[in-house]
C-alpha cells in the first residue's frame, strides 16, 4: 500500500510541475475559494489537466484537490446577465466589484456561472494517465 501511495505522489508531482510550466496568463489566476481541503476524490469535480475544464475555468489546486474554478480573463468577468440567477447580491457599478463568478447586472452582483465546474471527460488517448491514476486511487481504498 505504501508503494502505491509513493507512486501516486510521484505521478501527482510530475503532473503539478508539468501543468505549472504550461500555465498561460490569459487563463487568469486561481481564485481563493472556500472549498473543503479534505482529500476526497470526486471524479465529477477533480481535474488533473487544464483541458478537462470548460472555457473560463482553470484547473486549480485547493488543499490536496484540483478543481475547475471560475476565473477572470484579462480582468473581464465571463458570462451573461441573461444567465444570472440567485438572490440579489451586493450593490455594484462595475464587474470588478463582484466575485469572479458574478457580473454586475442592473447595479447588483449576480451569479452568472458556478464557482466550481464539473470536469469534462477526456478522450481515451488523452486520459491514459488520468485513468491510471484513478485506478491506482481505487486500489488503495
UniProtKB/Swiss-Prot annotation:
Keyword match Acyltransferase: no
GO molecular function: peptidase inhibitor activity
Keywords: Disulfide bond, Secreted, Signal
Gene Ontology CC annotations of this record: extracellular region
InterPro entries for the chain: Elafin-like_sf (IPR036645), WAP_dom (IPR008197)
Disulfide bonds listed in the record: 30-60, 39-64, 47-59, 53-68, 81-105, 92-104
Subcellular location field: Secreted
Family annotation (Pfam families): WAP
Signal peptide: 1-19
Record Gene3D superfamilies: Elafin-like (4.10.75.10)
Taxonomy, superkingdom: Eukaryota
Tissue expression pattern: Component of the organic matrix of calcified shell layers like nacre and prisms.
Domain WAP: 23-71
Main location: secreted
Protein name in the entry: Perlwapin-like protein
